[in-house]
Amino acid sequence: MYYLFHQPLHFIVAGYLYLTGSALWESTAAAAEGLQYLSLFYVTTASVFAAFILRELRLPQKIFYAGILLFMFNPTLFLFSGYISDDTPAVMWSIIAVYFLFRWYKTEKSLYILAAAAGFGFGVLTKLSVLMAVPAIISLFLCKISTSEGKRTDIFADLCLFVIIAVPLSLGWVIRNHILYDMQFYNIPDTSPWGQNFKYQTLGERIFDFSQISKPFINAPTAVDANIWLAMIKTELFGEWDMSIGNVFIYVPAKLFYLLNIFLKICTVAGILYLLHQAATDKSSRNKPFVWFFIVLYITLWGYSFKYAMDYPYVCSTDYRLFAQLILPETAILCLCAARILRSGCRKSSFPTHIWQKAATNFLPVAALLYALLSAFIYVYGL
């Protein structure tokens, strides 16, 4: 009963794969190692569907390839490739669901809404945090309803189809455990080790303590990074350990990588503000529903991550692996913002404005290339 709070899908798949591997190799150790190939499959599939999603946004070519680099060279995905846990398939299923939702939005084919509902349902059956996509999904349906005056009956029918498939898949396990074992809907037992405790830190320290901003690494469980935002930025790149221990030459590129990541996070927030302004002034943008989708998803996931870190004040609660679903909306927001600036620059503008627009749109491909090179170097040389 202690582990009934876990959604079962990943563990069922991994369990049968483990039994199959044990029978084939006659070695439980080899079978356990073989589960890493399952994680690699999840990461590869997530990357392919993320590329499909970026293609659906009809980005300029150089912005599209910049998005590919930012997503596929995100170190969290490197860590996930050999990581046997439910976080990896949760990311995969959520990305698959987003892709088919976008295809449904463009084509209005019920087959795509069936696939999206299955992807979402399997995602929640893997990890409950996939439910954080619900507000973004609702925003997409609302955009579709508001722009389809003559087809609203069909849209409502597709919405009902989505609910009929997704809800039983998503909540069946939770309802079963509540009926049989009186389990709460969202129950996380306190399993964190003593050395990770942040519960005596004030709210101000959890948000505004930037005393550790100069250090790119966290070394759990002795970490002192009470700041939720910094901890997530660091663990996105390097996990919960100091990679420079035993390899001092990795510190300089890691520090540069860390500073670049902070800058990209700032650009993401600025990009949200810019896209909101553009959405309010330009009523004809074809990407507006997807802009709203990613902004709502990004804000929801960050809000959830903050609440989770405050409710469970431990180092592990700010580990980026728990919120890796942020990788896609962050990448998409940066790409949508750069594409918007590039397209506005194609119109007639003054000389200084044109120069600024050119610099802004060239920044993302250059930053993405540097991001990919640093990420690859650190994880090839640093490990």
Regions found by a protein language model. Name each.
Residues 56-61, 97-113, 123, 145-147:
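Membrane-interface transmembrane helices that cradle and orient dolichyl/undecaprenyl
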Residues 100, 105-106, 133-167, 179:
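Perimembrane helix-loop-helix junctions
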Residues 33-58, 96, 270-274:
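Transmembrane-helix motifs of polytopic, lipid-linked glycan transferases
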Residues 157-269:
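Membrane-lumen/periplasm interface segments of specific transmembrane helices
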Residues 112-128, 133-134, 165:
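Membrane-interface alpha helices of multi-pass inner-membrane proteins
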Residues 76-90:
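Short acidic/glycine- and proline-prone juxtamembrane loop motifs at membrane-interface regions
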Residues 49, 89-106, 118-120, 333:
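Specific aromatic-rich, kink-prone transmembrane helix
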Residues 26-29, 45-73, 92:
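Transmembrane-helix signature of polytopic, membrane-embedded enzymes
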